[in-house]
Regions:
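Beta1-alpha1 glycine-rich phosphate/pyrophosphate-binding loop at the start
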Residues: 1-59, 143-144, 150-193
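Hydrophobic/aromatic beta-strand patches that form the interior of the parallel beta-sheet core
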Residues: 12-14, 53, 86, 106, ...
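Short acidic/His/Gly/Ser-rich catalytic and metal-binding motifs that mark active-site loops
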Residues: 20-23, 94-97, 249, 286-290
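FAD-binding core/adjacent interface of flavoenzyme oxidoreductases
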Residues: 51-144, 162, 240
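A Rossmann-like FAD-binding core segment of flavoenzymes
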Residues: 52-66, 160-267, 271-273
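Short, well-ordered coil/turn residues at beta-beta hairpins
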Residues: 70, 88-89, 216, 229, ...
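Short glycine-rich anion-binding loops that position phosphate/pyrophosphate groups of nucleotides
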Residues: 90-93, 156, 245-247
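FAD-site-proximal beta/loop scaffold in flavoenzymes
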Residues: 103-133, 224-225, 233-307
């Protein structure tokens, strides 16, 4: 743009954090395959020729072409004018539809989530190594992942590896006592991928000792158990939810073309019925130029597909 407009352009990026987290690497951080710093990049280092503002977007006024933000320690509202706007607000987590899930499930959205999950798994192993109660030990050594998308598949594989590597330090835990379960409500995992690749992933996970349950959802959960839609009661102290994505609250109240809370764009990423607004990432419904095997007409909201 600077070349085309001969430097008569000002670009500003607004983000809640001053760093970028590559979410597909969070399972590796949780599993210890990579360090946290490998999944994080400072925005000012990545993008040096634009203005970066650490702030939270509150609302967008299309008529007046302004964005209202909260910034600073006192979170004072500020109104920013724009000529052109790119919306990349991603998605939020909403686990409230399933009783108990919001209160008891771990998630995989942020760097802190990955660190928390790793610490939680180690704590469960520590507890299982010393307890004399069989039921408590069973719950501590049962790890349940909900969701068979990219995040769920990567997470379940990484935590299984972490547990397997750690067992040599816990003499009172046998490998046969470990149970790692993946629950997927659909009839297959990795719906974003061709069926052949999904089947390959399933076989790999099964060989590593992961138990996959398809066509199975969650009815409710507590801090000590999970009840599936088939009626099975799983004694578990670890529930990891990679489901429950919901639209950004900012987009929900923005009067613009949407489908299930995601912004409708054309193949140039321009928002429908607008001239100066674009949208990218999780919050956009992006049409595909070609339809690969087993895919819908729209691109899945995953970084892997974008790359």
């Amino acid at each position: 743009l600077k070349k085309l407009l001969k430097n008569k352009v000002s670009i500003e990026l607004i983000n809640k954090e001053n760093y970028f987290v590559f979410q597909p690497l969070l399972p590796e951080v949780a599993g210890g395959s990579i360090s946290a710093q490998n999944a994080v990049s400072p925005l000012r280092f990545l993008i040096r020729d634009i203005k970066i503002r650490k702030a939270e977007v509150e609302s967008i006024d299309r008529e007046n072409q302004t964005v209202t933000i909260f910034q600073g320690v006192q979170r004072r509202p500020t109104h920013l004018q724009y000529d052109h706007l790119v919306i990349a607000l991603g998605s939020d987590s909403d686990l409230s539809r399933t009783p108990g899930l919001q209160e008891h499930a771990l998630t995989m959205k942020t760097l802190e989530d990955a660190r928390k999950l790793r610490a939680h798994i180690i704590e469960r192993l520590e507890h299982a190594d010393i307890t004399q109660l069989p039921e408590v030990k069973e719950g501590a050594l049962t790890f349940t992942v909900i969701g068979g998308g990219f995040s769920g598949i990567e997470t379940v594989g990484e935590i299984k590896d972490l547990i397997d590597r750690s067992l040599k330090y816990y003499p009172n835990i046998k490998a046969s006592e470990i149970r790692v379960v993946l629950l997927e409500f659909a009839d297959r995992v990795l719906n974003e991928m061709p069926a052949s690749l999904a089947e390959y992933a399933v076989e790999k996970l099964k060989k590593r000792g992961v138990e996959l349950q398809l066509n199975v959802g969650v009815s409710e959960c507590t801090g000590t158990q999970l009840v599936t839609t088939t009626g099975e009661v799983i004694n578990t102290r670890t529930i990891i939810a990679t489901i429950g994505n919901s639209p950004s609250p900012v987009i929900k109240k923005f009067p613009i073309a949407q489908e299930n809370g995601r912004i409708l764009v054309d193949q140039n990423l321009k928002v429908k019925e607008t001239d100066n607004i674009w949208s990218i990432g999780d919050c956009a419904v992006i049409p595909l130029t070609e339809k690969p095997e087993g895919r819908d007409d729209f691109a899945p909201p995953t970084a892997q597909f974008a790359v």
